[in-house]
């Protein structure tokens, strides 16, 4: 492990303000590049085998559900349709509207009581209940300014001016755990409840929003290099997935379909490109050296209770029918994501993976451990590579020659087959420099470390499901609403999971985009099902989960379900499925 510290003097006030600017933070924009010897083993494009033929699958939509009963509060009834079969391999797509409502009459004997009794001031438009002392205080505590109407004298809310946390509103957005996209605002992080409680960061006064328990900025940044070597693709992928799963803690109540691909945004071309390169290396003849650096700059934590919801999100939840109608509840998850962020660490992350050809490596005097040691030396800030020694007999035992090989374009006969560089956080200049090098220089790493302060990103986060934001403070029928939202989340994740797609050939990844399944093919493989290749090497196939089976009947207030690792079955040394095969949860 090697560490480089960024001096406190470098963290001036402007950089602090900028690096907490989360306008660029929370939409993870990972820069990724790869390069390698694409011409090796190239021949005329062909199908890998005569058996690998793909047949178009047409999209199929279910019939309309029955109309729901007339909702007392909304005076509407609803119906919906679901995706029965996504299209794949060039099949006919679906063009449809999957939810409808129409006006209906409610008998006079029924009354609407969706808003709980307010013992303070009930805001006119948003329906928010605030303390009466917040009226006429010069701030929009209601979210519609109704608490400031008719005020004769409006005092200043705080005696001293205070800065607002830059980008704090972005942390209030929901997040879709299937693709890591940030969606609509679910929390109001510009609500202060009249408090002027200050927080000082390097002598600058910040005003703490009501929803926040903690927002801490580091006054000194540092990053560590962790260098690992892996004998095989399966070893590397197993380690990578375990690392990724520890970066996002998800409370959900039941497992996530397709957890092996959890959190990847396959709509991001740069993310897709890195996956294509790594999965191409699933043959048995590849080894890996991975170096990872992390720079943590800030921590964010919500309070545990009494959260103030964003007015629009509050109104959307209150407009849901009291009876369970999947189509209406599904739309909440489409618009606002599935979860909200309760804790986050902000900063930067850099991962550099070198893909080695084991057959060529065996013909040299180098070992996998030599590559690991020299990579570690080459990434050490200020390191003297001439002082690091490897296998005896290698040009005096110095890392110099090996690092030169890793730093130049891949040459014929080189053991370095390819590399993948992933950068999160940092300036455009530093990212461009890092992803264009096979082995980054210490100068580029320092430049990236400085850039992270101005443009940090998520490096770890903890999330909880949206339905946990439903409390009796804001909703009359909170128990029913929460139960319906939990049930809808299970249905939504099942309907939107890529497990519904047929397997792609040659270790391609099947991805459900809307109503269409696409195959993300390893580099060197093409076709709608990755069935065409210009390569002769056989690659492994990683296993993937089937969709979850139906929930069992409720017994002892519990129900269970299971799934199989057969979509596809792992073969030729491919990775086994990770995650639960069986699970149980409370009845809902």
Curated annotation (Swiss-Prot):
Query: What is the organism of origin for this protein?
Result: Paralichthys olivaceus
In the UniProt record, the signal sequence range is 1-30
Q: What is the protein name given in its UniProt record?
A: Complement component C8 beta chain
**Quaternary arrangement and interactors, per the entry?**
Heterotrimer of 3 chains: alpha (C8A), beta (C8B) and gamma (C8G); the alpha and gamma chains are disulfide bonded. Component of the membrane attack complex (MAC), composed of complement C5b, C6, C7, C8A, C8B, C8G and multiple copies of the pore-forming subunit C9.
Bilayer topology annotation: Multi-pass membrane protein
> Which residues belong to any copy of the MACPF domain?
154-500
Annotated membrane-spanning segments are 248-255, 258-265, 375-382, 388-395
The taxonomic lineage of its organism, from the top, reads: Eukaryota, Metazoa, Chordata, Craniata, Vertebrata
Function, in words: Component of the membrane attack complex (MAC), a multiprotein complex activated by the complement cascade, which inserts into a target cell membrane and forms a pore, leading to target cell membrane rupture and cell lysis. The MAC is initiated by proteolytic cleavage of C5 into complement C5b in response to the classical, alternative, lectin and GZMK complement pathways. The complement pathways consist in a cascade of proteins that leads to phagocytosis and breakdown of pathogens and signaling that strengthens the adaptive immune system.
Tell me which residues make up the EGF-like domain. 501-531
* Keywords for this protein: Calcium, Complement alternate pathway, Complement pathway, Cytolysis, Disulfide bond, EGF-like domain, Glycoprotein, Immunity, Innate immunity, Membrane, Membrane attack complex, Metal-binding, Repeat, Secreted, Signal, Target cell membrane, Target membrane, Transmembrane, Transmembrane beta strand
Per UniProt, Ca(2+) binds at 134, 137, 139, 141, 147-148
Occurrences of domain LDL-receptor class A (ranges) = 115-152
